[in-house]
Structure formats: structure tokens, C-alpha cells
A protein has these predicted regions:
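Positively charged n-region of N-terminal signal peptides that target proteins for export
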Residues: 1-6, 65
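Short, intrinsically disordered, low-complexity terminal segments
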Residues: 8-10, 35
């Protein structure tokens, strides 16, 4: 279906139109899944967009999405900005509208910035859901919520306090100052700190542009500027190993704690070496899997507004609260359990 539409565009416009499926076929490419569906009829096309396609977090989500696409027999497009870029996300959504995909699922870098494009997709009959980071509610049908913002913020602050003895200075490294989901997490981190751990003090908030090297540079600067700092909290996945490497190179392993939201595989060495104390997350492959299952159900009409549960293949049923499909609670990975996971 997609290739016929592309060929038609080539013939009419004489343009070289490129989306992610024209790029390399490695884990970060926008290539479609090649699974063939069982049964006849129109094959659904689901388009999945990360915040940044080189981020290992979203590559792991894609692995789960690919599994769901294969099981369902749907075509999966995967494309997104190289670096977090709301304007580029809008451009990709516009391309997908032109291609006539059946459903779009987006991890939104900026909820206000992308909502107009998503509303346009809905008006054209495309089913729209968000995952990981939401748009404005009227721009989509459902949000696949990896965990509630409160649950994430509280888990991070509770772990920080436990490691610091409920007092001392800490800093946060985020992806960007405009990332909607991270802004929400920060609100709940601060609410938890103020209500339960008033002797903990946040001394800095630094963006790393979702890049490990920049996170390492920011962490190095934080260590220099804040000699009494007891902990660095990294709330985007590239920032956790970046902060850990900075602490290690500064010779402050054990003196400055490192925690954050990240993947076990990216942080295993630092956790086992005692540089990173804990990594908090959810099963990212399950997030990608659930997102594609939900998008397909929405496109088929088996998932409708007002439903209280959704079936998601091998993962079973998931609760829906309002228009939020809930993956589950955050999970803490540490040196005692990290070798049990491979993602």
C-alpha cells in the first residue's frame, strides 16, 4: 500500500520523497517491518515515532513494536528526528498523513508543538495515539502511559533520599527543558521532596539534548561547581551512563551517587562497578509492543473511547484510566537484579 502511494507520488511530482523506510535497515532506521499478515483484506499501516531515533530507549521500544507488528501482520513504519526536534516531528507527521497510514503513534517532544499536526491527522481519518510523552488530549484518542508521572517522580525522589540519608544536595540532568513528560516528572520530584524530604536540596537542572557525551560534560561541570553535591539524578536514558562516566573519571565513585531512568544494558557495567546505584524504568520493549497493539486495535475499531481495558496479544489485558492505557509501575534495577534483564 505504502509503496504504491510512493510510486504514484514519484510519477506525479517527479520528486524524490524520502521517509524513514528509505534509510538504512538497522535498528534506528525508518524501515517498515516486513512481516506478512494472515488473512486477506487491507493490510494496516502503523507509523511509530520516537523523540529521537538513535536513542537506545526508543530502539528498545521499537524491538517490542516489531514483535507486535509481526504478530498482528501489520506494516510498521518507524521514523523520527535524529535529535529531539518538535519541528521535525511535525514534518514527519505531515508525510505520514500524505502516505495515508492507518494509525500514528508519537512520543511527543513538545505537546503543544505537535498537537496541530496530530489534529490534522485525526481530521483526515488517521487514528492517533501517543506513548511515552503525551500531546494535548484533544489531539489523540489514547495515551499509552508507561507509568504515571507521579509514580515516576516519587520513585526517583524516594530512591535519591534513601541513598543520601534524606539530606544533602542533588542535581538533575534532563534531555531538554521543553520535554513535556520530563517537566511533569520534575514537578512530582519536587512535590515529593518538599513534602517528605525537606532536607534534600536540588542545586541544578541541566539539559543534555538526549546525548551521552553532553550529559557527561554537564555532570563534570556540576561536580566542579557543587563540591557538596551527594547525588546526580539523570531523567533521560543517555544521561545515566554519561553522568556515571563523569563521576568515575572524577574519582568520586561512592562519594557522589548516580541514579536515573535508563536501560539495564546501557548501565550494567556502571551498576556492577558501584558507580551507578540504581536505574529506574519500565520494560521498554513492552511499551513498544503495547503501543502497536493499541494502535492496531484502534484502527480496527476494537478499541474505542470509554473502554476500560485493552487486549495486547501475549502481554494480556491492560487497564485504561480515562484515555490513558497504563503499562504499570516503575521498576528499580540494581546490582542484585540487573543481570536478570537484557534490554
Amino acid at each position: 500500500m505504502i509503496m504504491r502511494k510512493l510510486i504514484s507520488l514519484f510519477a506525479i511530482a517527479g520528486l524524490l520523497f524520502s521517509i524513514g523506510c528509505n534509510k538504512s535497515s538497522d535498528a534506528t532506521s525508518g524501515g517498515p517491518s516486513t512481516s506478512s499478515g494472515a488473512g486477506g483484506g487491507k493490510k494496516l499501516t502503523i507509523a511509530l515515532m520516537p523523540k529521537s531515533k538513535g536513542n537506545a530507549y526508543f530502539i528498545s521500544c521499537k524491538n517490542g513494536a516489531d514483535k507486535a507488528a509481526k504478530e498482528l501482520g501489520v506494516e510498521l513504519l518507524f521514523d523520527g528526528p535524529t535529535d529531539p526536534d518538535p519541528a521535525k516531528q511535525n514534518e514527519i507527521v505531515e508525510n505520514w498523513i500524505t502516505l495515508g497510514v492507518d494509525a500514528i503513534a508519537v512520543a511527543c517532544e513538545n505537546k503543544e508543538g505537535i498537537s496541530t499536526a496530530l489534529r490534522k491527522a485525526k481530521a483526515k481519518g488517521v487514528k492517533v495515539i501517543t506513548y511515552d510523552a503525551d500531546s494535548l488530549p484533544d489531539a489523540r484518542e489514547f495515551f499509552v502511559n508507561q507509568a504515571t508521572p507521579e509514580g515516576i517522580g516519587y520513585a526517583l525522589m524516594d530512591e535519591a533520599s534513601r541513598l543520601c540519608g534524606s539530606e544533602g544536595e542533588f542535581a538533575i540532568i534532563t534531555a531538554s527543558l521543553t520535554a513535556a513528560n520530563m517537566i511533569e516528572w520534575q514537578k512530582h520530584i519536587e512535590a515529593r521532596r518538599a513534602s517528605k524530604y525537606p532536607n534534600m536540596k536540588m542545586v541544578a537542572l541541566r539539559p543534555c539534548d538526549d546525548l551521552k557525551d553532553k550529559a557527561q560534560s554537564e555532570a563534570t561541570a556540576l561536580l566542579s561547581a557543587n563540591p557538596n553535591m551527594k547525588l546526580i539524578m539523570a531523567i533521560c536514558s543517555p544521561a545515566v551512563p554519561g553522568a556515571a562516566e563523569a563521576v568515575k573519571q572524577a574519582g568520586k565513585t561512592g562519594k557522589v551517587k548516580v541514579i536515573g531512568l535508563g536501560l539495564p544494558n546501557e548501565n550494567r557495567r556502571y551498576v556492577k562497578d558501584g558507580v551507578t546505584d540504581s536505574v529506574i524504568l519500565w520494560k521498554t520493549e513492552d511499551l513498544g509492543y503495547l503501543t502497536v497493539q493499541a494502535a492496531a486495535a484502534l484502527a480496527k475499531g476494537t478499541l474505542k473511547p470509554g473502554d476500560k481495558k485493552v487486549k495486547a496479544g501475549a502481554l494480556g489485558e491492560f487497564e485504561i484510566q480515562g484515555d490513558n492505557i497504563l503499562l504499570g509501575k516503575p521498576f528499580v534495577f540494581n546490582k542484585d537484579n540487573i543481570d536478570q534483564f537484557d534490554f
